[in-house]
Structures are given as structure tokens and as C-alpha cells.
Amino acid sequence: DVYKRQHFGNVECREGDDKSVFITALDHMVEFEDGKAPVQFLMTSCMDFDGKTVDDFTRSQMWDCQESRDRILEECRYSMLATDFLARGLSSLERANLEMDYLEALAELFPSCEAFFFSGSGKLFEAEEIRGNQIEGPDRFIRYAVNVRFFTIQGSDDMLVDTLGMNTLFLPDLQYHFRGLDPNWIVNHAYNVASYLLTSGNEIDSGETIDGIKDGDMDRSIQWKCQYEDALIQPKRPVLDINTGEYAAGNRE
């Protein structure tokens, strides 16, 4: 009932043989060459969970719940998988909104849920943050499903910021290899650019420029060149590398 009233409109639900639940969102159709079909969502039955399966690399980039991260991963004993089917055929914007509607529905449906983990980006949130969300529209996806990661390069002053999770929507992840800039400025810049790519529907091509940073804010008087490259940090994927001008580090083709 919570799905129908608040989140998906018209739905059909059925239970699988293994107690999984399939939810068909009848108001969200995907068109194919030979017809069309509604988007579906899956909730698996409860499974045992062992926090030790989350590696140190992934843990190191869980910036949104650093104080509670270890407690959650140590104390949680059960998990369930929630995902979508056929949603790849939707526009990036519609899929982002629909997935976040699903997230909010899950937070309501399972009041005893402690946390949400986004396997596509490595983000971990306490469930209460989802329940208290004040963000509307597609920026919910940027907040919860896109991880802006930060790395220092051993043996140098170089730093690297990248995003992980935009590729879920078939949009480019971002990458910045730089030195001499406040990394928090770059993190904010990355979230702003990611939001622009999702909400505007515009593409950024290799060789084009975007507004850079001055005193922590985006500034049109400074232009940073963009180009597509292979990611420097796992997982392997193409990224839109943003050259920070005089603060750029590393070699670019």
C-alpha cells in the first residue's frame, strides 16, 4: 500500500518461490523494438550479513557515516537486496527519480532497518537520514547514490577526487587529479557538475570547458578543460577528467 499511495502510482506485487517480492510499476513503461514493458523492482528475502565482507578500500570511502560505519558493519546481522529490472531503458532523469522513490518507500516499509548500502558507489547511510530527507527530485540520487571519493597519491602532494555511481545511469563519472587546492572545494565542484549532468540533460564533450573554482565557489572567469580518459582508480571505467588548470597534476594525453 505504501508503494501505491506515495511512490509508484499503480503497482502489482507478487511473491517469488524464495519469498522475494516483485513490484511492477505500471505507470513507468520502457519501450523496446518489439513492444514495451513496465519497470519492475525486486526485494529479496532476508539473508545473513557479515560486515567483514566489506573490504578496507570500500570502508575508507564511506564519508557519510564515518562515526557509525564500523558499528553498523559489525552489528548488522541481516540484509536484503533491493534493485530494479528493465529500468535501464528509462531516461537517466526518470530512472534516478524512480530509484530514489523506491529508496524512500523501503525506508518507510522497514522501520527497523538500520542502514542502506549502495553497492554501485560504496556509499553507506544510516536509515534515519533517508527517513529525514528534505531533498527533492533527482538531486536525491546525487546525494545518496553517487559517491565522491578522495585519495592522496603516495610520495607526492598530488590528490585525486572522483565520482562513482553516475555510470549506473549511463552518465560519465568525473575525475580530478590536482595539487594545491582545498580538496573540499573539489568535492563540492564534483557534486555540482554531477547534478548538472543529470538534471540538464546536456552532455560535456572532450575539449569543452566548464566553470572552475575561485575562493571555493564556481566562477565563470575560470574555465577548466574536460576530456574523457580511463579512470586512474578502480573500478575500471571511462571518466570525464577535469583539468584544474594551474593546479592540475599528472600527465594528460
Question: Predicted regions: what is each one?
Answer:
Residues H7-D70:
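Short, intrinsically disordered low-complexity segments
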Residues F118-E253:
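Aromatic/basic-lined ligand-recognition segments
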Residues V2-Y3:
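Short, small-residue-biased leader/transition segments that mark boundaries at the very start
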Residues H7, Y102-L109, V193-Y196, S200:
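Conserved short hydrophobic interaction patches
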Residues D18-D27, E114-S121, T152-Q154:
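Low-complexity, flexible helical/coil segments
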Residues T44-N147:
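Internal, hydrophobic cores of structured domains that mediate oligomerization or house catalytic pockets
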Residues E33-A37, L73-C76, F110, Q234:
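A short, structural micro-pattern
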